[in-house]
Amino acid sequence: MRRGKLARLRELGVDPFGGRFDTTAAPGDLKAGFAEGLAVRVAGRILALRDMGKSAFFVIGDIQGRIQGFIGRNEVDERTWEIWKLLDRGDWVGIEGETFLTKRGEPTVRAKSVTVLCKALRPMPDKWHGLADRELKYRRRHLDLLANEESAAVFLLRSRMITAIRRFLEGRGFVEVETPMLQDVAGGAAARPFETYHNALGMPLTLRIAPELYLKRLLVGGFTRVFELNRNFRNEGISRRHNPEFTMLEAYCAFGDFETMAAMVEDLVCHLAETFCGGLRIDHKDEEGNVVRTIDLSRPWKRATYRDLVAGVAGADWFDLDPAGRARRCREELGVEISDAMADHEVTQQVFEKLVEEKTFDPCFVTHVASPLVPLARLNREDPRLVDVYELIINGQEISPGYSELNDPDVQRERLEHQSGDETQKVDYDFIETLEHGMPPAGGIGIGIDRLIMMLAGASSIRDVVLFPQLKRRPSGGAGE
């Protein structure tokens, strides 16, 4: 049917795939600032169509808005009417006409001419039906955006929030920079990188797991407030909280510390919530729209030490037990799965993640973790077994780590060499040499943008806030199958 109409359009001398069409306003803007009697040119996809024989009401729009249109057989020439009758829901059109209000008060464009911009050869989906179609939504995001206004709203929200984050930081004197995605040494985090090879240079490279070491080079070079908002890549698991490529903000403030950055993150998140979510209470709903949890971002946010939180769930004597005793308690009393290959601090971290982090929904700054967990942070002066850091937990997951950055090159060398016992880690000796030129004391933060938007948008999966999440390839079928 659609291909038959395509052929007929061509017979009429109409290019079914259009070309340039100058507009006076977008559909949503035209409706928002509506006035009667205006001559307008507006373009969009036909989203709804009600044919009444000699006339038709229709809706055209895009991801940012829509407006109603009207066309009457007696109000256009014969050729325009014939072209109109060859159009379907899903086609892209340009409309030239005049604005008016219907008897029901609906802003409408009375079409005088119609320009075909693209004849769609496949129909639009009607709607999605719950969980049965979730994976199809992720694989064919274009159809999800067409059928689901809520999905479109989330991605518009994401775009506006990212713009607001940049403005917030620029307003505090931070300069945005770009650092390499392809790196000789994958540093700045404990994660397994994706590996590739540069043929012209004859050398292996990795996709970056973090920009941290390059941003610190800029502190050495004289930047005092610097940030990067870009992609990182980690060759690790996929879950509702993890995607192999993800958007990350990292920012560094010379002469600050982890407390400086904690205050700034609290300001930033509350600013986003008040600007885009209508307040500091964020409802999270199930598939039926029932509120299952409300996250309260009211200030001041809770602060607690890592040690106190772990002892609170694992026992006041947890840190007095030997490694065998801690392992036994995990298996016999706490129900926390651990492996024999885990180091002692990794066992404690597993307890923290399962019994504290995953059950903490309102904001909590967790401070002063064990030094082996964060080799790039400054040691605590009172207890060098700990580092001066925070981990911000909201909605059962880490949203942002913040550090007092380590700037002693000798200590940094020792700690990175100790960490490199993990086969995924290599020591970036060029970075250590850079530190020898002098890096000012600084506070640093990372914010997982995808997780932050999940929390603020009330989304249950990272796939709901990433336009094209990574999915396992299906064994057969065409693109997107």
Feature-to-residue mapping (PLM):
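Class II aminoacyl-tRNA synthetase catalytic cores and aaRS-like
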Residues: 1-481
